[in-house]
């Protein structure tokens, strides 16, 4: 069994999603990319136990905060990174530290996302 941590990436922007997947996989993480919260995720039938979820705030069906709350119902230990081009100008995110572990403004650098992920979930040495 591969000890690499699993990361869920949900972003409806294909370029951002693919860039995140590429960056995280090269860093040694296993990644499940999603465009939106799928029916299986909504029902709590997650294909993996995720250590971290990187969620865009603006999604087609629900906002990232609602996705984070649903995810935490089924995987309470999953750490949440909320990304948005509107940070820090989203007043609805104020006081959400119980749900969201880190906030990261778009655009972000490769080093910035890797630093945040490593703080929440380091890749084990091979």
Q: What is the meaning of each model-derived region?
A:
Residues 65-76:
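Short amphipathic alpha-helix used as the core "switch/output" element in two-component signaling
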Residues 36, 63-66:
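Acidic catalytic/metal-coordinating carboxylates
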């Amino acid at each position: 069994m591969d000890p690499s941590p699993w990361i869920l990436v949900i972003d409806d922007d294909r370029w951002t999603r693919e860039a995140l997947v590429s960056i995280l996989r090269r860093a040694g993480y296993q990644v499940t990319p999603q465009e939106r919260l799928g029916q299986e995720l909504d029902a709590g039938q997650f294909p993996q136990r995720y250590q971290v979820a990187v969620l865009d705030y603006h999604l087609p069906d629900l906002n990232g905060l609602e996705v984070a709350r649903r995810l935490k119902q089924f995987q309470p230990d999953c750490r949440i990174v909320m990304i948005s081009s509107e940070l820090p100008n989203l007043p609805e995110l104020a006081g959400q530290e119980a749900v969201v572990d880190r906030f990261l403004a778009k655009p972000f650098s490769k080093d910035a996302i890797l630093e945040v992920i490593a703080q929440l979930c380091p890749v084990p040495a091979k």
